[in-house]
Curated annotation (Swiss-Prot):
It comes from Salmonella arizonae (strain ATCC BAA-731 / CDC346-86 / RSK2980). Required for optimal enterobactin synthesis. Acts as a proofreading enzyme that prevents EntB misacylation by hydrolyzing the thioester bound existing between EntB and wrongly charged molecules. It comes from the Bacteria. SUPFAM superfamilies: Thioesterase/thiol ester dehydrase-isomerase. This is Proofreading thioesterase EntH. Homotetramer. Dimer of dimers. Interacts specifically with the aryl carrier protein (ArCP) domain of EntB. The active site is at 64 (nucleophile or proton acceptor).
Amino acid sequence: MMIWKRDLTLDELNATSQNTLVAHLGIVYTRLGDEVLEAEMPVDIRTHQPFGLLHGGASAALAETLGSMAGYLMTRDGQCVVGTELNATHHRAVSQGKVRGVCQPLHLGRQNQSWEITLFDEQGRRCCTCRLGTAVMG
């Protein structure tokens, strides 16, 4: 059963990214499941750190993008969410290809939410685990 309170398509989700950091980093929403939101991000010159590896800040941006959008999908008209805390643990370096982010709820309260976002490389190996806290406003 879908947990989402807003009924948006992947095309509509991706349209919200135009002219934002999300678009600049090449992040694309790829799956909206019953209790999961997924997106991909390229690992290339836009997301590398100086030594040719995926920048931890880019991983954090993907995680916050997914968690914030998932949080928004859990709100009703007149409400929005804002991030309150982001934690990222980097497990494995990635130098090329894409990473896939998988966002799932840990806690869905009336005033706050917690999301787990796991990033995987193209071989399906976990490369980063994040937790995002959000506050529901409005």
